[in-house]
Amino acid sequence: MQAKSGLLKMWHNNVFPHALLIAGSEGVGSFPLALALVQYIFCENKTEFDSCGKCNGCSRAARLEHADLHLSFPSIAPKPGTKPMSRYYIQEFREFVQQSPYGTTYEWLQHINAENKQGNITADECREIIDTLNLKSYEGGKKVLLMWRPEYLGKEGNILLKLIEEPPKDTLMIFVAENLEDILPTILSRTQTVKLGPISAAEIAVALELRSLADGNRAAQIAHIAQGSFTEALRLVRQADNDLFPEVRQLFNAIFTNNGVAIAKFAEEWSKAGREQQKNFLHYVIQLLEQAIRARYMPQGSVALPEAEAQFVQRLAGNKVSFEALQKMVATIADTIFYIERNAHSRTQLHALGIRLVYTVHGHTIPA
């Protein structure tokens, strides 16, 4: 990976930043890169190009168990009367990372049975981080803070500003983020940012085959649809067991027939799901719509999807819906995801979404 080699070069030139922000969209490998850097930092036999992968430092870092590695991530209160703190979930986080190094925040929160609760990195946790990093190193070397998803800091992140700007000696901070726009500008300005691009379809296909998740044409098909996200590729593999397509078809039947009762039912049923489940469903709808947009310029049969979904996409790509309407539908759904992420009332948002999609499909202007 080019980003990793560049960072290792900075290490050997003694210009490695004390506060590094690795940013990349879901599934491009931001956390695996951060973990590889942590392992390199603690490696006892590092070379110019990589960690040895065999020493005690490497093995403990890979398991997130090194005494001088301090972890911070979104969490929830473990029981009433307590506050969300990462230290309550360290073992669960280690297990999660071992199982799902490309895992999402939603998957992590489900792993700790958060249900509909949204994770947080609290002011109390920020103060604990400051206290911890001001202690001496347990093993006499570097101390490393690895914070996954600093977007969940909110305004509480300002508590860390002095620490980020003037860290204790031999202290490094590595932040792993997806959405730079959700991070406080005061934190962004104090870190050096490395942005990761999408993974190539060829790399995703090889990874799926190596893990025996898909082979041959199916691996290539999934890699093409995943659009550079290994997380999306894994989601597509799992969709055979958790098929959302019937729900999508039901929604669009309601939209095309202007069935207000069915749209209200859709909003009511999905409002009972967790916010992350709602977002996953809407992202899936966007994925199908984007495939339909591409299909406008591709020959018949070239859409890389299972048969039922491919037929649905081809119908959308035909004369059923205009190109402009498809684009507007994607933008409308993206807006709904934005508001759901910010705790808007989900049933209201989903009902409004259904109505807006009806207006878009049938070529009407929504009244002001």
Model regions: which residues?
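Clamp-loader machinery-focused feature within the broader ASCE/P-loop NTPase space
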Residues: 1-155
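Conserved catalytic/switch belt of AAA+ P-loop NTPases
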Residues: 134, 158-169
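Conserved adenine-binding aromatic site and its adjacent loop/helix in ATP-hydrolyzing domains
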Residues: 131, 162, 189
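Residues immediately C-terminal
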Residues: 152, 166, 182
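Charged, glycine-rich active-site and insertion segments that engage polyanionic ligands
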Residues: 1-42, 46-49, 53-60, 169-172, ...
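Short hydrophobic/aromatic-rich motifs at helix boundaries and adjacent loops
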Residues: 101-103, 131-134, 155, 175-178, ...
